Amino acid sequence: MIYDKIQYIVALISEFARHYNLNDVQVARYMSRYGALDLCDSEYEVMHTQSFNDMVKAVAEYCKHNGGLL
């Protein structure tokens, strides 16, 4: 289960990076700074059943709500 969660978060970071034309390190730092990595960890069971496109949008909104500027 932990391996699946890690794979999912890595894939989500990659999709987020592609969507916003950033690199994976920038996105990982951004998501960490605004609490999205913790969100992905705690809400994995729901998030992994949704499309990456929807989750990129949801994570972006979550980060924005917490002070992110993307």
Language-model segments: residues:
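N-terminal acidic leader/helix
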Residues: 1-26
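Serine/threonine-rich low-complexity intrinsically disordered regions
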Residues: 2-4, 40, 49
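Generic structural signal for hydrophobic core residues of well-folded globular domains
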Residues: 16, 20, 31, 59, ...
